[in-house]
Amino acid sequence: MAFSIPIPKFFRSKELIGVDIGSQNIRIVKLKHSGNKWTLVNLVKDTIPQESISSISPEERKSVIIDKLKKLISSARVDTKKTCSSISGGSVIIRYVVFPKLSPQELSQTIAYEAEPYIPFSINEVNLGFHIVGDVEEEGQKKMETILVASKKEFLREHIEILRAAGLQPTIIDIDALALSNSLEVNNYLPSDATVLALNIGASLTNLIIVENGILKIARDIFIGGNNFTQAVQQTMGVDFATAEEMKKTYGLITPQEKTIEAKDEKFRVGGALASVYRDLVFEIQRSIDYYLARSPEKSIYKVYLTGGSAVLKNIDANLSNELHLPVEVFNPLSNIEVAPHIQPFVENIESAVQLSVAIGLGLRREGDA
């Protein structure tokens, strides 16, 4: 599954590095392809300190990210500066729409006109991209299901400026949701005869996708992430962010079997704080499932995959399975990818591996992908 927002290209070369700039972490990967096998040959990463970053201006934050990118690129010693990176968040709009049947070339030429009714911004303020899902017929007319992506020009411009200021050459701009889909696909997590739902629970938001028979049907961002869980603990327990983060990891969510714990118990108080955010997340997940099933009443969800930093929050998989009445499994984006020996110590535990799902999806891309 491919998508890109067109940006100027400087050189022609297929190999790219995947650059995942999240709200809390930066990850850069390089993947090599040989035969039917992918190998992770390079990985560098760094964190963006939350408490210090929240007290500085957007321009200062931008400088911090550029500086960290420069240091990571220097330490990685990669043989290309061409990148595939991704965007997400409030300045990125993802819509599932049905357009008149057109070729990709025709849609590229008319996308502004076709997209205008679906975009809550002025069409002149956004860059547009699309991913054609497949053909459908409505009232005897041939049409096509399409995932439409609009990014505010200012937001995209800043993203590109950051990459260039760090000495990189932005070549493909993707979205997190499609990178996640690519990551699932290469690891053989997308059956050709079933529908799966995947959640990438990052620091500030959750990417949700629903993939039917290997075809992406729904992609959206939910503005709930690991930091929301941490902040809920911080507020309830009256501690700083770092302490709240440790409490979150130590105790996790309360299971139905643990509901008898005394209310004054620290585990119960932390679990109660986490539960308030968790309920909001479940509500949004269920909304997406209901929307999908309303459009495809003959279908059902086969399985839910969890990835991202909060995929390993204690009991979140069991609780989600109980709430959604579906099997839930943690997705390891390296399960079908070889890892170079010098990288293995950094990804051998699942807590580290699940944070690479978007980066791996980006690293799979090659210049010239449709």
Regions of interest found by a model, annotated:
Residues 1-370:
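Hydrophobic/aromatic-enriched cytosolic interaction surfaces used to assemble or bind macromolecules
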